[in-house]
């Protein structure tokens, strides 16, 4: 009896040891899988990646060509006694915006404007952690374009291709707010709403810029873009009324984006207003 009881207990102890060993091995495997999964997840979404670097480069190049084309039209018009003409300048700005939207829109979203980037961020359509890099890229592109233009045409005051208030600062501030509101409202409609025809976004945004420059250019210069003003100001050393071209576009863009969001959906609560996108859906995955 005693011998048989010892054999059964020994078998039970061996069984328990095997079960405990199996549980320990399974736990180690699960921990290893979790660690590997977390590492893989962090590698898939790093703070800085090649993909994001490509977006930043696209913003630099897109802003460079936009500012170079638009400001070159202004500089050439002043140097040649008005051969480009004011309507020609307006058309140049509109076409430059349209071309850049179609060129880099599928890569970076073609913000090309710190006010647009900030407005998208406030609506939850662009990650806040990416805003400084985008804004720096846009200002850098504008400054590089301005430096190239200065090298080509010189920096004489009479050939100034930046923006400065033609009237009072308050008048220019109001004008910049309104035209940037208008621009961002259109951008939100044609570039972020699934119901809009996304393929026409570049045409619509470019046409809006053309119209804005046409009627606001003689008043404020129709900047609509802090980078458009800051770049030439840095290179040419002229900062007259620069605060107007930062405050006006920033507040106008944010207001325009939210105004469209308020009318985007009529059958959904406010908390769902900023949950869809079409043309800039790539920026939401950053």
Swiss-Prot record:
Determine if Transmembrane is one of this entry's keywords: yes
The domain comment in this protein's record states: Aquaporins contain two tandem repeats each containing three membrane-spanning domains and a pore-forming loop with the signature motif Asn-Pro-Ala (NPA).
Localization in the cell: Membrane
Name used for this protein in its record = Aquaporin NIP1-3
Q: Where is this region: Disordered?
A: 1-44
Pfam families from the UniProt entry: MIP
What parts of the sequence cross the membrane?
56-76, 84-104, 131-153, 172-192, 200-220, 239-259
**Residue span of motif NPA 2:** 225-227
Q: Which Gene3D superfamilies match?
A: Glycerol uptake facilitator protein (1.20.1080.10)
GO MF terms on file?
Answer: channel activity
Q: Where is the composition biased (Basic and acidic residues)?
A: 11-31
Q: Where is the composition biased (Polar residues)?
A: 34-44
Assigned GO CC terms: membrane
Q: What is the lineage of its organism?
A: Eukaryota, Viridiplantae, Streptophyta, Embryophyta, Tracheophyta
Which CDD domains would you find in this protein's record?
MIP
**Family recorded in the similarity comment:** Belongs to the MIP/aquaporin (TC 1.A.8) family. NIP (TC 1.A.8.12) subfamily.
Q: Which InterPro entries match?
A: Aquaporin-like, Aquaporin_transptr, MIP, MIP_CS
**Which stretch carries the motif NPA 1?**
113-115
Membrane-protein topology: Multi-pass membrane protein
């Amino acid at each position: 009896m005693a011998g048989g009881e010892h054999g059964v207990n020994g078998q039970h102890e061996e069984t328990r040891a095997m079960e405990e060993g199996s549980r320990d091995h399974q736990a180690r495997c699960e921990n290893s899988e979790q660690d590997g999964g977390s590492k893989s997840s962090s590698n898939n979404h790093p703070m800085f990646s090649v993909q994001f670097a490509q977006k930043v480069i696209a913003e630099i190049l897109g802003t460079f060509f936009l500012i170079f084309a638009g400001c070159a039209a202004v500089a050439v018009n002043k140097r040649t006694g008005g051969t480009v003409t004011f309507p020609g300048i307006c058309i140049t700005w509109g076409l430059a915006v349209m071309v850049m939207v179609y060129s880099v829109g599928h890569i970076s979203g073609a913000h090309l404007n710190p006010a647009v980037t900030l407005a998208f961020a406030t609506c939850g359509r662009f990650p806040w952690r990416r805003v400084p890099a985008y804004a720096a890229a846009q200002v850098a592109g504008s400054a590089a374009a301005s430096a190239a233009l200065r090298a080509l045409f010189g920096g004489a005051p009479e050939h100034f291709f930046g923006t400065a208030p033609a009237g009072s600062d308050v008048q220019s501030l109001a004008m910049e707010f309104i035209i940037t509101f208008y621009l961002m409202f259109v951008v939100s409609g044609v570039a972020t709403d699934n119901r809009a025809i996304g393929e026409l976004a570049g045409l619509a945004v470019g046409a809006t810029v053309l119209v804005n420059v046409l009627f606001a250019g003689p008043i404020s210069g129709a900047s609509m873009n802090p980078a458009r003003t800051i770049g030439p100001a840095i290179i040419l050393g002229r900062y007259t009324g620069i605060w107007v071209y930062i405050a006006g576009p920033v507040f106008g863009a944010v207001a325009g984006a939210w105004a469209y969001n308020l009318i985007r959906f009529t059958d959904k609560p406010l908390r769902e207003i900023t949950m869809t996108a079409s043309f800039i859906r790539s920026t939401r995955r950053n």
